Amino acid sequence: MKKIVLITGAAGFIGSNLAKNILQKDSVVQVIGIDNLNDYYDVSLKEYRLKELNCWDHFSFYKGNIADRSFLEQIFREWEPEIVVNLSLIHI
């Protein structure tokens, strides 16, 4: 059974590199990435990073905002992650 890791901010610099590192080292880990792809940083750069991550069959991406409770609950119900790494930037 695969261990499931959820990474928020997965399209950002740190989140994408963390996901890539996990994916390269361990094929028994399913990485779930969440990002809202906002334009605070260059969106095309975020899309490029996700394109690289999507090369692994044990990576799944969801576009959405972690402030949306129903969205987040759906992800948790579907995947039941064992580890959550929150690297999202929330604007106040």
Where are these regions (language model features)?
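N-terminal Rossmann-like NAD(P)+-binding domain of SDR-like oxidoreductases, especially those catalyzing
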Residues: 1-90
